[in-house]
């Protein structure tokens, strides 16, 4: 039978901790980008054409903020999947401890 166990107990626990931290951080960043926080303007990928040549510059900037917000939420979802994988590895390691060799 093929074993799905590919991580040790310490690596799996570390993966859970990093995933929880990543999900919390990315959800907060996504919320802050969604409310168009002025502090995060440096992280919005805009060019001078977006500001000076656009007849309605705030609308373009708001779309860019929302795009970065969606990217943060997608990355948080990926971290949730990786956290679930790490949790499964922890469970498999626990089950391996109880098996008789």
Curated annotation (Swiss-Prot):
GO molecular function terms noted in the UniProt entry: RNA endonuclease activity
Q: Which domain of life is it from?
A: Eukaryota
Has keyword Nuclease?
yes
Localization? Membrane
| Chief place of localization | membrane
EC number(s) on file: 3.1.-.-
Q: How does it sit in the membrane?
A: Multi-pass membrane protein
Q: EC class of this enzyme?
A: hydrolase
- Name the GO cellular-component terms: membrane
Provide this UniProt record's keywords sorted from A to Z: Endonuclease, Hydrolase, Membrane, Nuclease, Transmembrane, Transmembrane helix
InterPro entries per the UniProt record, alphabetical: Ribonucl_Kappa, RNase_K
Q: Which residues cross the membrane?
A: 13-33, 68-88
Q: Which family does it belong to?
A: Belongs to the RNase K family.
Which function does this protein serve? Endoribonuclease which preferentially cleaves ApU and ApG phosphodiester bonds.
Q: What is this protein called?
A: Ribonuclease kappa-A
Source organism of the structure? Xenopus laevis (African clawed frog)
